[in-house]
Amino acid sequence: MNKFVVLSLIFIFSCELLNSHEINLISESDFVEIQDSDYTLIDVRTQDEFDLGHIDSAINLDFYSDTFQNEILSLPKNEKIVLYCRTNNRSSKTATILKENGYKDILVIRGGITEWVKNGNDINYTTYSD
């Protein structure tokens, strides 16, 4: 009987831990509806990828940068954050890092910029002048 209780408790706590780090995906069409709200939009692609086209108002924090983890974790924990990358790999990893560090309101755009462009949404380009 005691083994059953202990195993049940371990299972319950394990499930709770897994759920606490679950990644919340949002469709690009749902993001369009909240785009002008108080969410901070973060593009975790490289600077070169960002320059080739990004969603309006996005902040670029390069996932591969040596300072990435310090930069992303410097955001206030109560910040509402929407993440995207090219397809979801880097943004999902970033969401996990944030969740593991106590951030609560994190969304990831399903399909990333690839899905965004595929569905005909506008992108901005970075231009440099000499």
What is the meaning of each model-derived region?
Residues N2-F4, C15-Y39, Q47-K80, R86-D130:
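Rhodanese-like catalytic fold shared by cysteine-dependent sulfurtransferases
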Residues S8-S14:
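Hydrophobic membrane-targeting signal helices
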